[in-house]
């Protein structure tokens, strides 16, 4: 993947490069088992947070609200994005170390059903490793006729995701995460039918408007604004390797590494922050030792200097 960054110079408006970008977008939909007629991947130049901005700013109609199932930093980031755009929020708040109570989620949505258009929840809270129940929350959203959006930035490409089985209308990620490319390109995968409806929604942003980017790509086969050329080359290679290894084998490889780390953490007498059944296994959060001799910076520097 790193070698794929070294490529011949090319104008980002060349048809040859547009074809590469189209193939990357199609492959991203395949990763989450979406059908091309139903789902589309829309690419943006930027970090993963740009997709939070895109989703919140583009998918909520004027005078409607977003309900955020909020138990961590990344859900809170979506809440802040909504506040910046003046979008009404129903903040369904839970403790950062606890999974959302589905009964409370449904009760809250039912109470606010007339006002809410979109239900939003992160799949994995990266700070804790907590894995949220997207399938169940998505089912609740659909029961009340709402669009369900999940920030799958830190899981997509490693944890198996199926947009149909997991009740996902929209999900998102960025190039450097689960697909294992390099930083600089993020993407929102969503239902074409709903994106088409957003044409008449409030236009809250110029650069991060989903309809603008989607419709330009649909017509011209390329991104509206300058794409991160080298990063898309790295995505092309990373996706090739993803499909060659296979979803199941890749997931099992990551879980084997996770088990090894957990075993060594336990051997050091350290304690994991969360019960394993609450996590994906991709993030292993450790309780900060109470020993006064523990120095995080020294531990960090030692690991860094030894390439760990």
What are these regions (language model features)?
Residues 4-54, 58, 73, 81:
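Conserved N-terminal alpha-helix of the aminotransferase class I/II PLP-enzyme fold
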Residues 60-76:
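Conserved PLP-anchoring active-site segment centered on the Schiff-base-forming lysine
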């Amino acid at each position: 993947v790193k070698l794929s960054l070294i490529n011949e110079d090319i104008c980002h408006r060349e048809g040859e490069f547009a074809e590469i970008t189209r193939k990357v977008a199609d492959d991203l939909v395949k990763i989450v088992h979406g059908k091309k007629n139903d789902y589309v991947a829309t690419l943006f130049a930027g970090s993963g947070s740009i997709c939070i901005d895109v989703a919140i700013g583009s998918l909520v109609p004027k005078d409607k609200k977003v309900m955020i199932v909020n138990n961590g930093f990344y859900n809170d980031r979506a809440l802040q994005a909504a506040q910046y755009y003046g979008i009404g929020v129903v903040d369904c708040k839970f403790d950062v170390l606890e999974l959302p109570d589905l009964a409370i989620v449904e009760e809250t949505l039912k109470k606010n059903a007339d006002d809410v258009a979109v239900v939003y929840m992160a799949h994995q809270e990266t700070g804790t490793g907590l894995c949220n129940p997207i399938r169940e929350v998505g089912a609740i959203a659909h029961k009340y006729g709402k669009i369900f959006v999940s920030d799958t930035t830190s899981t997509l490409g490693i944890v198996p995701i199926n947009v149909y089985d997991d009740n996902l209308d929209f999900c998102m990620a960025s190039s450097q995460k689960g697909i294992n490319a390099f930083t600089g390109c993020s993407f929102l995968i969503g239902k074409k039918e709903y994106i088409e409806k957003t044409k008449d929604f409030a236009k809250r942003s110029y650069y991060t408007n989903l309809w603008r980017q989607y419709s330009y790509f649909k017509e011209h086969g390329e991104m509206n604004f300058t794409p991160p050329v080298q990063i898309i080359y790295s995505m092309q290679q990373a996706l090739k390797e993803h499909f060659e290894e296979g979803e199941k084998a890749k997931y099992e490889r990551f879980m084997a590494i996770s088990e090894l780390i957990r075993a060594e953490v336990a051997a050091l007498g350290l304690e994991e922050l969360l019960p394993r059944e609450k996590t994906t296994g991709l993030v292993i959060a450790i309780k900060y030792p109470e020993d006064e001799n523990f120095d995080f910076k020294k531990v960090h520097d030692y690991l860094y200097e030894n390439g760990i």
